[in-house]
Amino acid sequence: MSEFWLISAPGDKENLQALERMNSVTSKSNLSHNTKFAIPDFKVGTLDSLVGLSDELGKLDTFAESLIKRMAQSVVEVMEDSKGKVHENLLANGVDLTSFVTHFEWDMAKYPAKQPLVSVVDTLAKQLAQIETDLKSRTAAYSVLKANLENLEKKSTGNLFTRTLSDIVSKEDFVLDSEYLITLLVIVPKSSYVQWQKTYESLSDMVVPRSTKLIAEDNEGGLFTVTLFRKVIEDFKVKAKENKFIVREFYYDEKEIKREREEMTRLLSDKKQQYQTSCVALKKGSATYRDHKVKVTPLGNPTRPTAGQNDRESEGEGEGPLLRWLKVNFSEAFIAWIHIKALRVFVESVLRYGLPVNFQAVLLQPHKKSATKRLREVLNSVFRHLDEVAAASILDASVEIPGLQLSNQDYFPYVYFHIDLSLLD
């Protein structure tokens, strides 16, 4: 499953034993895989400031999740024919999202734990806001390009009445630069081809004999040329319409046709060069990604290999700027999101369990959807004794307190936050 439960309990002896009981029961019943989730010690500040931060982090959490989902959807749209390999391009620091979450380690260089919590939150908020601003401008430019290209493509795929003729006609099909003569294009139903050949010369005076030629056709009819004197154009149109032959308003302009063809070529080239897709992950250790060391301490299984032993290495090739930007900044936004989750656990744990700071965070990955109800029952049973501590801290679980974001629906004896990696659902 791509679902995780991030919980915490007080770090005293009694509750550490409760965590071990939880791990034992969930392991034997095959309910979940549990991993310690390391969160650094931060400067706590006042409890009032923590309540405010709790509210701000809740909003930032929602914003970050929405942002990475939008970015994931943008990757889908850009990759077009390679949509089946989208997940290979949705990585965090060069590894798949599940590996990053289960091997999470706080980035001290980017978000120093020695800074006040409010500064760390502000850094995360500004980073995500900038990514969203850039996402809007880049995807807007892509949408304009795509729309312009689709409009030109529609003109090339319609019927003979509406489609562009620049890719059908040629200079040789027309009498040009004549003071007296002009070549018209006439759409003739397929059932009337024979009638057209027999009557077009007599539809009006001054029609050049044997001047008609079929130059294109679709399922409904054909496009014929006919040359006549300019002064009988209107008369010819009227007589043609009476016979269900439609004169297409088109006059050969070599410069305009050249411009239209060049525009199509330019748009196709822009889309290919600027937004070309690749299903290969960015090369590990490139300037784009900082090497990320990962470390994990699984409960009851200290010999489990670390993520570094399974790092993926592949070299990106043929990536256009938009896809490359999306991959890099999706990674940055996702990493920021998991850091926000860690901060929420820290802040909520201090508000719940009090000072001095002493709690243990654990990441649970339910093995299957059908087991989540049983897993919740196990957790509620193991940590039932925390109700008294929580009640003393939050006064009344049935009353929503600004910042704590608790209610009857989502209140549990332990700190709990949900992480869902189903970003494309």
Curated annotation (Swiss-Prot):
Tissues and organs where the protein is expressed, per its UniProt entry: Lung, kidney and testis. Expressed in both bronchiolar and alveolar lung epithelial cells. Isoform 1 is predominantly expressed in the lung while isoform 2 is strongly expressed in the kidney and testis.
Q: Give the start-end ranges of region Disordered.
A: 295-318
Q: Would the keyword Transport turn up in this protein's UniProt record?
A: yes
A single Gene Ontology molecular function, please?
Answer: identical protein binding
GO terms under cellular component: vacuolar proton-transporting V-type ATPase, V1 domain
Q: Name one GO biological process term.
A: positive regulation of Wnt signaling pathway
Which keywords does the record carry? Answer: Hydrogen ion transport, Ion transport, Transport
Provide the function of this protein.
Answer: Subunit of the V1 complex of vacuolar(H+)-ATPase (V-ATPase), a multisubunit enzyme composed of a peripheral complex (V1) that hydrolyzes ATP and a membrane integral complex (V0) that translocates protons. V-ATPase is responsible for acidifying and maintaining the pH of intracellular compartments and in some cell types, is targeted to the plasma membrane, where it is responsible for acidifying the extracellular environment. Subunit C is necessary for the assembly of the catalytic sector of the enzyme and is likely to have a specific function in its catalytic activity.
Subunit structure as annotated in this protein's UniProt entry: V-ATPase is a heteromultimeric enzyme made up of two complexes: the ATP-hydrolytic V1 complex and the proton translocation V0 complex. The V1 complex consists of three catalytic AB heterodimers that form a heterohexamer, three peripheral stalks each consisting of EG heterodimers, one central rotor including subunits D and F, and the regulatory subunits C and H. The proton translocation complex V0 consists of the proton transport subunit a, a ring of proteolipid subunits c9c'', rotary subunit d, subunits e and f, and the accessory subunits ATP6AP1/Ac45 and ATP6AP2/PRR.
The name this protein carries in UniProt is V-type proton ATPase subunit C 2
Q: What is the lineage of its organism?
A: Eukaryota, Metazoa, Chordata, Craniata, Vertebrata
